[in-house]
Amino acid sequence: MDFSEITQSIQNNKKEFTITILEATQALCVVIFVAGRGGSPVRHLPLLRVVAQHGCTVIAPHFEMLPSLTPTKEELNARIEQLETVLRDYSHSHQTLIGLGHSIGATLLLALAGGKALTFSGHGIGPHSIWKFERLALLAPSVDFFLHPGALQTVNTQIYLRNGRKDTVTPPSKALLLKQILEKQGHVDFLLDEEAGHFSYMDELPPQIEDSQSNREVFLVDLARNIAQFVTT
């Protein structure tokens, strides 16, 4: 299916930030993509283009890189505010709303869907509203934000969850725990990628990162195809 691709600026509380839009012709759904700590959706563009080719308009905000592996309440809430601006502007009641995120981006999607997240210092983060996602595709999410009682009991949506067995940033044991918690509320498709690390899900690796996934091209093609099938099912 045809789609157009543009990058433009929008405003949030008089502050401008950038979004990339991959707009599908006669879109079947709207996908909000949320990048990880680095904040750039450009590193995932091949994946997002495949999703757009399958008939979904993709909205991908650009964020400033988080300076620390343990982000603060203020840093995370700033991203959530940008995401809520995007959701208000680009989600429509007549179109299915889907979230797709990697690492801390996947974590923020869970918060937007109703999860009660706490920072490592115990401060609550979260949106002003609970957004009704039809489905969430979560790649190597940061789980520790939701390990307190009742954190995810209000999340009620279909989940596609993938994690790498060789992930040392968000270990597979945490992903399995997240699966066990989430499947109490609804259906969870979980896939543990045997050779994948934390950054294997990025089409363009960050500087100085070597991937444990030996055949990246085949892996990324299969990843994109499976995610596209999930969001359009």
What is the role of each PLM region?
Residues 124-187:
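The feature captures the conserved acid-bearing segment of alpha/beta-hydrolase catalytic domains
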Residues 6-98, 200-213:
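Serine-hydrolase catalytic machinery in alpha/beta-hydrolase-like enzymes
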